[in-house]
Amino acid sequence: PSYRFIKIDFTDRDGLNHLFESEHFDVVVNLAAQAGVRYSIENPYAYIESNVVGFLNLLECCRHYPVNHLVYASSSSIYGLNDKVPYAETDKADTPVSLYAATKKSNELMAHAYSKLYGIPTTGVRFFTVYGPWGRPDMAPCLFMKAILNGDPIKVFNNGQMRRDFTYIDDIIAGLMKIIAHPSADPIPFYIYNIGNSAPVELMDFISVIEKTAGKTAVKQMMGMQPGDVVCTYADTSRLENDFGYKPSTSIEEGIRKFYDWYIKYFNK
């Protein structure tokens, strides 16, 4: 298939409108956002501008230049203070502990409103700790890999007493491809899916896998809990499995090995 890259900030309302008017999109997959829990504490306005205003611009474009399906990235962080695990899409998600999480919850509410008002099929996908090649440099897999290979200390928050549902990028993409082809046919065509490995990993075990893969020992700097963080993320993927017969399956050992191989090649280590 043909591919074109067009650089545009989706807070640019006029530019985005012109793009939709000229291209006549069938499906829109929005993975653009100001991401990250900790950075949202330092730079809150960036999150409102990108994640709320930018998403509103996108919804308006889908309204005025109708599409068959809008799929957008939500986040596991919207589950906030929920202590019930694993997290299911039907669980309440009204207690965010970061502005980032609040903006992602806002996206879901805004999408529901546009699905109800204008019949736009929208699907929010709650990603759980995505990692792999081309991953964000501010996330633990990249930070830990870089530090361990360079012999620098790593910051281990909450003294390592955390669990994350690490999900390999290929599994995320496979799940997205299933979802994209199946917009909701409900009277209000709005839906939500979790995509996660459904196998949370202790942070210290995660570090051990990187150490074993890299053949080096981490220098650990134990830290307290960071504001905006949660102790555990854990996806219930029953809805994804029931609707599409799909479940992410890449083990943390296999995923880190693939990530390590890419990292070494990319950075010529």
Kindly give the residue locations of the regions a language model identified.
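C-terminal substrate-binding subdomain of Rossmann-fold SDR/epimerase-dehydratase oxidoreductases
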Residues: I8-D9, I148-K269
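N-terminal Rossmann-like NAD(P)+-binding domain of SDR-like oxidoreductases, especially those catalyzing
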Residues: P1-V130, Y246, W262, Y266-K269
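The catalytic Tyr-centered alpha-helix of NAD(P)H-dependent dehydrogenases
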Residues: T95-T103, F127, P133, P137-P141, ...
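Short glycine-/acidic-enriched loop or helix-start segments at secondary-structure transitions
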Residues: Y39-S40, L81-D83, W134, F166, ...
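Hydrophobic alpha-helix immediately C-terminal to the catalytic Tyr-X-X-X-Lys motif of short-chain
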Residues: S106, M110, Y114, F144, ...
